Design a protein with these regions (language model features):
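Regular secondary-structure segments
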Residues: 44, 131-142, 187, 191-194, ...
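Hydrophobic alpha-helical core bundles mediating ligand binding, dimerization, or RNAP-core interactions
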Residues: 130, 134-138, 155-163, 179, ...
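Short, conserved beta-strand element in jelly-roll/cupin
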Residues: 34-50, 66
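A hydrophobic/aromatic-rich effector-binding and dimerization subdomain
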Residues: 1-24, 72-141, 164-169
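All-alpha amphipathic helical-bundle segments outside canonical DNA-binding/catalytic cores
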Residues: 125, 141-157, 177
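Short acidic-glycine-tyrosine-enriched beta hairpin
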Residues: 54-68
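Basic/polar phosphate-binding segments, predominantly the helix-turn-helix DNA-binding elements
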Residues: 161-167, 185, 189-193, 197-233, ...
Length: 288
């Protein structure tokens, strides 16, 4: 069961979203679940197993889990008492292009990769500060008159705690470079136009760079390959349509998400999610 707590949207789409998830006990299939959005999860009750890449974490109440963009994670086991959690997702562009705080100067790849020594699970006894901020954000979303600046301020404090107290990020809070700005502009363009027939030449041309140099720069600055980023955006959109738009067939969904044929769509979807679009549409499990 999913209970939407609230979201903050801009003209470019949903910026931040928070919801509560309740999952019944039992084993769950391993799905290569990942997304561009940065994720922070609070376990409020129950137990289970989180599979993150090659690691497995025993889930316990009041723990915090943190997942970078495109980091594969999946709950593969839920204990006999079920599992209850609150998820917070925010887009990388939340950190980009703002002038009112130093978080806008975090390296572009903050959301895409963390320190190699960072553990995805923050134990309950070390998570008190983040848990308190997280709970306050959920309470703000539950109010009838939401004040977006409050939720965003709380998120800022959570990010600062991850950097300062838990060694999430090795990078420095330095001023953005021209290269950072180029890649930020490119990702914003992709986010708005991923449904279209994007080409390397088009994206490179927006920045006045050669295709080879632009492709290399995108990977270096963002920490993710250009076409992996584009396909992730397209697959995320396809997953939403597969679950929420039963009137659309798979060919129509592929077209709406920027794939020029179903063969490419099926291949990209299975590579990302681990199952075919048809299997995903028929599955009853909430992928978390």
């Amino acid at each position: 069961m999913i209970n939407e707590l609230g979201e903050i949207s801009t003209s470019g789409g949903v910026l931040l979203k928070m919801w509560e998830v309740i999952v019944q006990s039992g084993s769950r299939p391993l799905v290569r679940h990942s997304h561009i959005r940065f994720e922070i999860t609070l376990i409020t009750a129950g137990s289970g197993i989180y599979t993150v890449g090659d690691k497995k974490y025993a889930i316990k109440p009041y723990e915090i889990f943190v997942f970078a963009s495109n980091e594969q994670h999946c709950v593969t086991e839920v204990g006999k008492d079920g599992l209850k959690m609150i998820n917070l997702h925010f887009e990388p562009r939340y950190l980009w292009g703002r002038s009112f705080d130093r978080l806008s100067n975090v390296n572009t790849n903050f959301c895409f990769q963390h320190s190699p020594n960072f553990e995805n699970c923050i134990p309950a006894d070390r998570a008190r500060q983040i848990r308190g901020l997280f709970t306050s954000a959920a309470e703000e979303f539950s109010k009838k008159e939401q004040r977006n600046e409050v939720q965003l301020c709380l998120l800022n404090m959570i990010i600062v705690a991850l950097i300062r107290d838990f060694g999430y990020f090795d990078g420095a809070l330095s001023a953005p470079t021209d290269k950072n700005r180029i890649i930020r502009k490119a990702t914003e363009y992709i986010d708005m136009h991923f449904q279209e027939n994007l080409t390397l030449e088009t994206l490179a041309g927006l920045s006045g760079l050669t295709p080879n140099y632009f492709s290399s720069l995108f990977s270096k600055v963002s920490g993710i390959k250009l076409w992996d980023y584009i396909n992730s955006r397209r697959i995320e959109a396809a997953m939403q349509l597969l679950k929420n738009e039963s009137n659309l067939n798979i060919i129509e969904i592929a077209s709406k998400c920027g794939f020029n044929n179903t063969a490419n769509f099926n291949k990209a979807f299975k590579k990302t999610v681990g199952i075919t679009p048809g299997e995903y549409r028929l599955s009853d499990n909430i992928i978390i």
